[in-house]
Amino acid sequence: MTFLESNIDELVTANHPYRKILGLIDFKELTKELRKCYSNLGRGGYPIESGFKALLLQYMEDLSNREAQRFLEENLAGKLFCGFGLKDQTPEHTYFVDLRQRI
């Protein structure tokens, strides 16, 4: 099996702090009200849970928008935390600005 065929879940240690946060917080429930900020029309974007987790990660790691973009591109634990797979496209820096304004 090659690296890209691996499951991201297998590549992040079981005791990683981000996993602990995922086990403590029900993000679906937490973001229930935020779903109202999204329309069902138009092309789909990133799931609101992923966006909210990305903003939380940006805050916890003290990242600028561009740093958050790069962090999610390069950091496997960050991808796992936000619900992105190894090959998934992650948000560009402008996404973080847009999401904060929306919510």
Question: Predicted regions: what is each one?
Answer:
Residues 1-103:
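Short alpha-helical elements
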